């Protein structure tokens, strides 16, 4: 593995796209990391401004620069709009640097699905190791380039993975119906009328119904497809007037009844070595995970025998920057929880 030993020197890290909410969250977490030094912050729309002009509560003394192909840092974290990282990552990787991309540019293996859900073309080679530590810890540790999961995808995959990948005998899933609610920060920092206070206060709405870009990412990771006729997956994303957090309610119809105890044992065993996944006895809440890298999971049964899985994450931390730092820790040989607890 191409690790940079923690004890030898501090690792230099630069953030491309540091002016957005996820980028700023990266800066906040990186400032707490004992093994790294923030080298540069790139944001072409804010070039020349000091980071603290945008985020006074985060005491980073860096000035935003314009990225023009620099490869002087050991690690590059990219928090750019979809489509932009495709142009930058190949050059950074070719220079022998480590990369973690937070966009959706390198997640999907199926190029037709990428075009359908994201727009634009990409080649079949434009896929990086998927960065979900709870599922791919060893692969991430041996990688030099990672595609960070999406925020909704993180909350839903972690809720479903034990059912699809845990190997419990007699547990067959017929369909999954997901309603997931996100805080407004999930829509990004750019000004949009529909996200303004007067539009969102006291309001709530569904969006991208039937066409959210995280749907094929979820299916790919769970080992099925959005076009598989034998499996029914319905995902309804919603936005609500709070700042951060994703609350996902997953209603899972099973082919035959199962008892709660073996299901809880399945989840507990599956995540036994996952420091950021917590199986809760009661119903979890967004406030339980806000500003943390935790994913909380609650389990219950409906009267018809359907399994109800509830997950809660912070969309900017576990759903973005925190998971990226978790991946970086694994890539570089740091403790997985460094700067996150």
Swiss-Prot record:
It catalyses: N-acetyl-L-glutamate 5-semialdehyde + phosphate + NADP(+) = N-acetyl-L-glutamyl 5-phosphate + NADPH + H(+). GO terms for molecular function: N-acetyl-gamma-glutamyl-phosphate reductase activity; NAD binding; NADP+ binding. Its main location: cytoplasm. It is found in: Cytoplasm. One of its GO terms (biological process) is L-arginine biosynthetic process. Keywords: Amino-acid biosynthesis, Arginine biosynthesis, Cytoplasm, NADP, Oxidoreductase. The keyword Oxidoreductase applies. Its EC number is 1.2.1.38. It is an enzyme of class 1 (oxidoreductase). The keyword Amino-acid biosynthesis applies. Belongs to the NAGSA dehydrogenase family. Type 1 subfamily. NCBIfam families: argC (TIGR01850). This is N-acetyl-gamma-glutamyl-phosphate reductase. It comes from Chlorobaculum tepidum (strain ATCC 49652 / DSM 12025 / NBRC 103806 / TLS) (Chlorobium tepidum). The gene is argC.
């Amino acid at each position: 593995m191409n690790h940079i030993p923690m004890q030898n020197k501090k690792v230099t890290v630069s953030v491309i796209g540091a002016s957005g909410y996820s980028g700023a969250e990266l800066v906040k977490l990186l400032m707490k990391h004992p093994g790294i030094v923030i080298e540069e912050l790139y944001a072409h729309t804010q070039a020349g401004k000091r980071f603290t002009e945008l985020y006074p509560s985060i005491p980073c003394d860096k000035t935003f620069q314009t990225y023009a192909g620099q490869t002087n840092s050991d690690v590059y974290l990219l928090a750019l709009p979809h489509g932009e990282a495709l142009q930058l990552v190949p050059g950074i990787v070719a220079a022998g640097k480590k990369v973690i991309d937070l966009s959706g540019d390198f997640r999907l293996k199926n190029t037709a699905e990428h075009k359908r859900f994201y727009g634009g073309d990409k080649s079949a080679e434009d896929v990086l190791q998927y960065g979900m530590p709870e599922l791919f810890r060893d692969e991430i540790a041996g990688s030099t380039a990672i595609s960070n999961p999406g925020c909704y995808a993180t909350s839903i995959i972690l809720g479903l993975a034990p059912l699809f990948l845990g190997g419990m005998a007699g547990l067959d899933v017929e369909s999954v119906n997901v309603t997931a609610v996100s805080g407004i920060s999930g829509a990004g920092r750019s000004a949009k009328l529909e996200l303004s206070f007067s539009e969102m206060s006291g309001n709530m709405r569904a969006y991208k119904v039937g066409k959210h870009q995280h749907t094929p990412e979820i299916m790919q990771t769970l080992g099925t497809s959005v076009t598989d006729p034998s499996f029914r997956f319905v995902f309804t994303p919603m936005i609500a007037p709070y700042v951060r957090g994703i609350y996902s309610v997953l209603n899972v119809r099973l082919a035959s009844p199962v008892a709660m105890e073996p299901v809880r044992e399945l989840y507990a065993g599956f995540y036994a070595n996952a420091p950021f996944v917590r199986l809760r006895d009661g119903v979890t809440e967004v406030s339980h995970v806000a500003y943390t890298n935790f994913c909380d999971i609650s389990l219950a049964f409906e009267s018809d025998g359907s399994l109800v899985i509830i997950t809660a994450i912070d969309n900017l931390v576990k759903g973005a920057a925190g998971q990226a730092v978790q991946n970086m820790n694994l890539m570089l040989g740091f403790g997985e929880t460094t700067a996150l607890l």
